[in-house]
């Protein structure tokens, strides 16, 4: 705002000055053209009494007529002029003659237009060059010195790239203690090239080196060298290294060096390439006749394949540090860095988020945290919950929802069956990533989608996985054909077909997955002219081989189509159920998809349109509605109580009735079953006291009904044991035998069936 206002003020002052100057020159010219007369005419007007006043200024005479018109002339040396004026009764005014100011003003007025033109040219060039230092500042380096005011970044602010940090730590140590390395004859790398995909933190790593080493740090972009004038790029490279030598030891960071370091000899035509001249100067400065010790050049690029080989050789870029996408542990650390200033709810689990975001870069994770914070603020929440993180993850991965898109019922049905086909095939192929979410709500440029998330980071793909992936891609088109007929299929599978063709061709031409073509790479000629490669390259694929490649690609896709057709016909009920579920709920998570195809409604919280916070890629531990599992877990934590014969007998009667009705898989599923285990072996010896223990049956039944509450079971069992001990008159040997048997009953769950059978016989 200030710079715009300043520019506006400058333009306004220039315009005002030009207007005043024009008025001044124009007025003088008009006055000069209207009042100039000859000396004879001036004398004649005096004699004719036409002049009322005459002003004498040296040799200049200025007269005023009766009608107030001004005339002027230059008089020679005329001694009788004053007498003549007095004779004609003319009012005489004498003005002292001016000094050399008139000469100066005349010179100024003559040079002023030239000065204005030169000033305007300088102003325009400064604007075009982005504020270069003066009109002759084109060749000056545009490298900026990073200061503390711009924020100090250290290695603590960089996470997820531990190997890269270790490689760069040596540079920091050298800048701090150069004698440590020089004592053993070591030489620090003169240049370090950071290579990695976009968003992995290459620039942040460079800034952290400057913060750790505490040395001057110059930063410049690769596009800041070459501009409109010839020779500017090379001049800026020289000036940049001259500034670095004055501030040595220091670091120079060139971001996106591929803009200036591309392979030489690229392009068509024989004209001069300013970029090549700049690159040559950079090569000389990095490793030429003049050594540049204590100057470390760090560069970053995501296109190392297009760089000139001379730039990558040892002595210039001695070390190449790869900065890949982070793994699970790295993503968790990156999330911890980005949530430092974000208030989180207690249910936020960064480990779960890291597992559910495979392939995310550091920039993607930063965007994820920012989107979650914005969603929480728009929902008027004081903290960011796990729901916001899940919604933000879906928005980043699948695109923003477009619920305003008007879709007809026919389009919704077609989309639902299409996406259900993808999901059912994904659930039934041999190898596949878990289904994370299926939706028919338009997101991004798609009307619907099925999202799959791998359970972990994948670094290689198997043949079976690729074939299964092809079948999943064909699932949507197969579903349309089976449901609506071949004549009613739509263009909705265009993206699926394109991706399937690309994958199948890569399987044949790059990865050798064809028995007919063998383990040979048949790469297409995709090299671009301006990447420094030769224009004319021979294609090593014959027409017959090209036809074979097309046939093999067609075969893989046809096989995938048949596989998808077979799966959807076999799992027809599940497919139809899932399609109806999508029409009803619009969006289903992986867990909800399994519930829908099993004939159950999705377990969602009432009054909420959103899905529960769980995904198939990050499953929850334990089942939510599995009562048997929860009972068995409680039973394992509860120790069996010591009961008397009467208590054991009454407990055995209750448990045996349940055990005979249940399957053998639910052995030892409750606390009462465990408590009945020692009783089952001693039921014959205690049958005489069964009648006296029947009074405690109600207490045991109430304890059995409360098996989910471990504390209540323990209290009820202790109460039963206490009352049974008081009523029982067993001898000490019998009690000792029962206690020993109870201790060993934990590891003898298999005796339940035999004990239950003996109990049944005794009861009869």
Curated annotation (Swiss-Prot):
Assembly and partners are described as:
Homohexamer.
Which NCBIfam families does the record associate with it? FtsH_fam (TIGR01241)
Protein's name in the database: ATP-dependent zinc metalloprotease FtsH
Start-end of Polar residues biased regions: 603-618
Q: Where does ATP bind?
A: 196-203
- Gene3D superfamilies in the cross-refs: 1.10.8.60, 3.30.720.210, P-loop containing nucleotide triphosphate hydrolases, Peptidase M41
In this entry, the parts of the chain located on the Periplasmic side of the membrane are: 28-102
Which GO molecular function terms does the record list?
ATP binding; ATP hydrolysis activity; ATP-dependent peptidase activity; metalloendopeptidase activity; zinc ion binding
* EC number(s) recorded for this UniProt protein: 3.4.24.-
Cellular component (GO) terms are: plasma membrane
Details of cofactor binding: Binds 1 zinc ion per subunit.
Q: Which cofactor does it need?
A: Zn(2+)
| Residue stretches of biased makeup (Low complexity) | 641-662, 669-685
What is its membrane topology? Multi-pass membrane protein
- Which intervals lie on the Cytoplasmic side per UniProt? 1-6, 124-764
Residue ranges spanning the membrane: these are 7-27, 103-123
Q: Which residues participate in Zn(2+) binding? A: 418, 422, 496
Q: Which residues form the active site?
A: 419
Q: Which InterPro entries match?
A: AAA+_ATPase, AAA_lid_3, ATPase_AAA_core, ATPase_AAA_CS, FtsH, P-loop_NTPase, Pept_M41_FtsH_extracell, Peptidase_M41
Q: Where is the composition biased (Basic and acidic residues)?
A: 732-743
